[in-house]
């Protein structure tokens, strides 16, 4: 039995991924305390057990708030759990291990919000107690909502700053582009429609191409052309340095929260 503790947006996204993969509804339980949310989960996942109490199980996904992880982990002491996947931001593996007596395999992961539509980018790190089977189990869950890479735990803060917070950077870019279109005379509706498709199309082109982002950029940047003028303005305003500063600030904050 696999218990997903926390039936919020990310927890329910993982359940959808599991059900779309090799897991059956009978193999999954969702643990959720909020009564209103329980009703919503029962409506969406008709054949999945939704409960306020964690059943005995050998596998757990921790999808609760970071501040609740230690308390929830302590409650798993007598549940028979042998492997845990935590997606709680900033909570170190050692903190989870110290809350549960015995030898438990703990994997810590950092997904991002596109996981809600099965297009997430996740990074994971395994504890010393993990074997190949534990790692494969965690990967299988995360692959249900997108892609996954393995990194050392100390790099998960950098992952948080880059891909964890990254969707917000992209959405801010979208806001700025829409506003720029309006400033040049387009209606907000037209500008919004163009920018949304711009981001979708460019992302798909990047994902499906064997070329680097730099190569793709240069292909659409003719010397002395319109794109070259726009790129020159971005470079002059230190666009790369601004992005680097944002990722650095988010990484630093992740480290602070993990102390």
Across the structure, where does each feature detected by a protein language model lie?
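Short pre-catalytic strand/loop immediately N-terminal to key active-site residues, enriched for Gly-Thr
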Residues: 106, 156-161, 213-218
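Structured catalytic cores of enzymes that bind and process phosphorylated ligands/cofactors
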Residues: 7, 30, 132-133, 243
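Internal alpha-helical scaffold of NAD(P)-dependent oxidoreductase catalytic cores
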Residues: 95-105, 121-159, 170-208, 253
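Small-residue helix-packing motif on alpha-helices
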Residues: 28, 38, 69, 96, ...
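NAD(P)+-binding Rossmann beta1-loop-alpha1 motif at the extreme N-terminus of oxidoreductases
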Residues: 1-50, 59, 119-120, 182-183
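Rossmann-like NAD(P)(H) cofactor-binding subdomain of soluble oxidoreductases
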Residues: 15, 43-124
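NAD(P)-dependent Rossmann-like dehydrogenase/reductase catalytic/cofactor-binding core
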Residues: 196-259
